[in-house]
């Protein structure tokens, strides 16, 4: 991981892209931390919880930074729930439009919250969810 040049956020724009391997992700940690601080203040002022959506941003190399500010992770299945458990702190909320029966026990064990897509899903998986003391919800 390359460090920001001099720690000055203005230097990020001067980054020599030829120095970077390709492909790669380039993250301005200073800008990210500034945004996380805004979210943290919003949480304090409004008494809400904010979760990171791992489907959109699953960069586990900066999970410690993100976990200092956010309340947990929103996962879209078993593998994201495993990622959240291993690298991120806080609660794990898992949603899937179609949970697989052979994965649901493990998803329930990893997750604090399960969000279902239909009443049929609730009927199918309710007993397993309750066995692991998951809070449940339905997506509308």
Annotated model-derived regions:
Residues 48-140:
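Active-site-proximal beta-alpha core segment in soluble small-molecule metabolic enzymes
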Residues 4-5, 135:
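Intrinsically disordered, low-complexity segments enriched in small/polar residues
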Residues 5-26:
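Generic N-terminal amphipathic, Lys/Arg-enriched alpha-helix
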């Amino acid at each position: 991981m390359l460090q920001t040049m001099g720690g000055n956020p203005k230097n990020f724009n001067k980054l020599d892209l030829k120095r970077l391997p390709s492909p790669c992700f380039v993250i301005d940690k200073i800008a990210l931390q500034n945004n996380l601080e805004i979210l943290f203040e919003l949480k304090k002022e409004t008494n809400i919880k904010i979760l990171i959506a791992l489907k959109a941003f699953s960069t586990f190399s900066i999970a410690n930074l993100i976990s200092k500010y956010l309340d947990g992770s929103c996962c879209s299945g078993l593998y994201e729930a495993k990622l959240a458990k291993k690298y991120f702190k806080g609660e794990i909320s898992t949603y899937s439009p179609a949970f697989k029966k052979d994965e649901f026990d493990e998803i329930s064990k990893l997750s604090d919250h399960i969000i279902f897509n239909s009443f049929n899903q609730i009927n199918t998986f309710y007993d397993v969810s309750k066995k692991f003391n998951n809070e449940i919800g339905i997506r509308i």
